[in-house]
Structure formats: C-alpha cells, structure tokens
C-alpha cells in the first residue's frame, strides 16, 4: 500500500519543482454579506493554468458592505476609490482557500 501512495506524491513534488502550476481550491461566492456569509452562488472553484483565487471587498466609508470570491485569470491586486466607496481586490495562490472573506 505504501508504494501505491509513493508514486502520486512523487509526481506532485516533481511537478512543483519543475514549475508546473498546481490546481488550487478557492471559495466562490457571487455575493458575500458584510458578516462573511455567502448570500448567492456558494460553491468552490479550482484554478486552471495561470488563474488565482481572488477576493473583492466593497467598503462604504470604513465599513465592509459586501464582497465577491472566486477564481480569475486576470488577477491584479488593486484598490479603487470613489467618494465614500472603496473596492479592494486581492489575489492569492499560496494555499487552498486563501481567499477567505
């Protein structure tokens, strides 16, 4: 049984050493409430290719209003500012479910 587990583990280690991207599980939700509860479209996604997990939070003043989580190919961390509204967009690829609200 130990030999059966050794081959998949060896393949994972070799692929990470050679730079092949590993699929990453991310939280996915179309609308996360200010308290962190998914209100619409709760599921998980798995990154493919150069995708990363993302988390977008929308603030009104200094208070979180709502958010959005998922997988994205276009993932550039940034902040947008408008009068009384801030949108914070963050990306991660360091660990599974790194886009927790």
From Swiss-Prot:
Domain of life: Eukaryota
Residues of this chain annotated as glycosylated in UniProt: 84
Signal peptide location: 1-23
Disulfide bonds: 26-53, 29-38, 45-71, 75-91, 92-98
Pfam families per record: UPAR_LY6
Subcellular location: Secreted
Keyword Signal: yes
Keyword presence, Secreted: yes
Primary location class: secreted
Keywords assigned: Disulfide bond, Glycoprotein, Secreted, Signal
Domain UPAR/Ly6: start-end pairs: 24-101
GO cellular component, one term: extracellular region
The name this protein goes by in its record: Protein PIP-1
Organism ancestry: Eukaryota, Metazoa, Chordata, Craniata, Vertebrata
């Amino acid at each position: 049984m130990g030999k059966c587990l050794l081959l998949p583990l060896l393949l994972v280690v070799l692929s990470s050493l050679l730079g092949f991207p590993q699929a990453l599980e991310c939280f996915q939700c179309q609308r996360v409430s200010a308290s962190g509860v998914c209100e619409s479209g709760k599921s998980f996604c798995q990154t493919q290719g150069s995708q990363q997990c993302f988390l977008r939070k929308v603030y009104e003043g200094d208070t979180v209003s709502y958010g959005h989580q998922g997988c994205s190919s276009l993932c550039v961390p940034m902040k947008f500012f408008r009068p009384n509204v801030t949108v914070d967009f963050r990306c991660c690829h360091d660990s599974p479910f790194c886009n927790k609200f």
